[in-house]
């Protein structure tokens, strides 16, 4: 059975609806309700939730520099008063289990790419290239489809095994860390806001009496990275004429697996080979701080942590601050704990009346195990 609706009956209804909407949103009635006063637009803004595992560092100030003149050379002290806005900071160090989640995510993303590759069977369900209406979208991985660990086909098994290798001496199957590369992009909002980089030449100069050359070529630098035919990461900073917003996008590729050999290289003659083998990979050290991570890897972890959070937040993600490393001033401000204090505790002494250090200063000669630890301890223990 088909239903027909006459246009003649619809038009009066639409007209009435438009008049009603105009009455609701019209300026005259609003002005009458407010007595003609500008009271500001009211809108509900969702409160920013407390980030998991983080604490709020409230705004304040600190003095940066020497607090006393150099007694040897008599150099004048140099101090600066710096105001710091509030920010969130991790309550503890990033643990092995947290960073291992990052490494495994990178591994799984590589596997999904390969499972969708025709060289490994070409399962297109692991990569989304069209939306539900069949229109093309920016290709992205399908994280809703699980990896076929239990009963893989021959092609799938080749893909799953491609990120592992076998130790030539003891036959141990281990992750091929050289393949664990994380690619991410950042948009440089600060550079895009500078007037000299405005896409419209008329916006580059505030003085309207100054003539602006519309054909002026503005050069911009950006970071980019790619993997060459030998599997090596190539990082470049290129300069090119500014042409679009894409010129403010920087691309980075970072090998994310931590350097586990620091246990041997940084502590010679310490017999630390067992920590080199087990500290990062063993569940026994899940709650211990990750070590052997470079600044570039820490930046990549922040980018991944942001991406991971935004994917889980949905539309509310636009109100959430992105993860980043603290600045030098923010770190010092958080470490001091209080305004005007050299240390987070009262006074300028580094030891208490029993001779014990208040914090992790380099200790003197003595019994390093007296506090129950020889290497790093579980996070949050002190």
Predicted regions and their residues:
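Bacterial N-terminal signal peptides that target proteins for export
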Residues: 2-12
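Conserved hydrophobic ligand-interaction patch in extracellular adhesion modules
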Residues: 88-92, 102, 108, 114, ...
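Acidic-aromatic/histidine active-site loop/patch
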Residues: 95
